Amino acid sequence: MAAIEVGRVCIKTLGREAGNTCVIVEVLDKNFVVIDGSVKRRRCNLKHFEPTDKKVDLEKAASTEEVKLALDAAGLL
């Protein structure tokens, strides 16, 4: 399993945004992170997404525009 870290690209597996690509922008604690990307920026339980082996270069708490630019540059959006 890939590490849970800022910049890790993930796929949502549960909820209304299931199947969409997202990126971890902040780690809150051992159970929750903040995600953004092709999903609405929100807090998300670790059980609701699957991390991939891909990672984009982002700083902690990056803006939505920075996240979308990084995903677009990596060809993931």
UniProtKB/Swiss-Prot annotation:
**Pfam families, from UniProt?**
KOW
Sorted UniProt keywords? Ribonucleoprotein, Ribosomal protein
State the species of origin. Answer: Methanococcus maripaludis (strain C5 / ATCC BAA-1333)
Coiled-coil stretches noted in the UniProt entry, renumbered to this chain: none
* UniProt-listed PANTHER family: 60S RIBOSOMAL PROTEIN L14, LARGE RIBOSOMAL SUBUNIT PROTEIN EL14
Could you confirm whether the keyword Ribosomal protein appears in this record?
yes
- The protein here is known as Large ribosomal subunit protein eL14
The UniProt entry's sequence similarity note says: Belongs to the eukaryotic ribosomal protein eL14 family.
Query: Which GO BP terms, alphabetically?
Result: ribosomal large subunit biogenesis; translation
Gene Ontology CC annotation, any one: cytosolic large ribosomal subunit
Cystine links in this protein are none
One example of the protein's molecular function in GO is: structural constituent of ribosome
